[in-house]
Amino acid sequence: SVPGYSAEAQSMMPHAWTSGTQVQLLRSKVLNMKKGGTFVMVPPPNPYRCPPGPYERVSMIAHLLKERNPTAKIIILDPKAKFSKQGLFMAGWEKHYPGMIEWLDPDTHGGIKNINVATMEFETDLDTFKADAASVVPAQRAGSIAMAAGVNDGDWCPINPANMSAKADSNIYVLGDASVASAMPKSGFSANSQAKVAANHIRGELTG
């Protein structure tokens, strides 16, 4: 979903969307930025797991840079025109990290045309941004088990909202991030609520 980005690029521009070595790698790259350097963040397009996640990450990186590299800059090249809890995040950034974070929506940057991983350059219609460290989170989709089960329609799995069963197979229940659950965000709270709906339905089916 991001031209020029690939699985091989993860070592240079970690997505760090899973815990463990990717997160450690990203932290190391941020700490090793030159003084006054630039960090570039590319969030994923909708829908994706944990809508506030990329912006929480930016906040954490800004906190780290404020202590270790206060003249550094963070540029967010967002594929979305707006994001979750935007007003709160932008007010917090202005209060705690004034002048450090610049959020650019697609109308401003015109879209990412290419990423040169070797030179750490992000080409957009607006400009070419050179990063000293970067995190790219590409578009997401349901896991391979959903594809293997044949309950997906494209990248995600349509469900019957009354009981969370898959529209493609009522004997299979799809919960959480993989499901297309109307306006419910792909969050832990949503998954927990959906699990209770599915469990109650299954219990009803078993007990009559």
Task: For each feature predicted by the language model, list its residue ranges.
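Acidic, glycine-rich loop-and-strand cores that form catalytic or ligand-binding grooves
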Residues: V197
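FAD-site-proximal beta/loop scaffold in flavoenzymes
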Residues: V2-K35, F129-S193, G204
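Generic recognition of short, well-ordered alpha-helical segments
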Residues: P52-E56, G87-L88, K186
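C-terminal, flexible cofactor-proximal segment of oxidoreductases
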Residues: I202-G208
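Rossmann-like NAD(P)H-binding beta-loop-alpha module
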Residues: Q22-A72
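Cofactor-binding loop segments of dinucleotide-utilizing enzymes, especially the Rossmann-like FAD-
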Residues: P44, P79-A81, D177
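A Rossmann-like FAD-binding core segment of flavoenzymes
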Residues: H63-D155
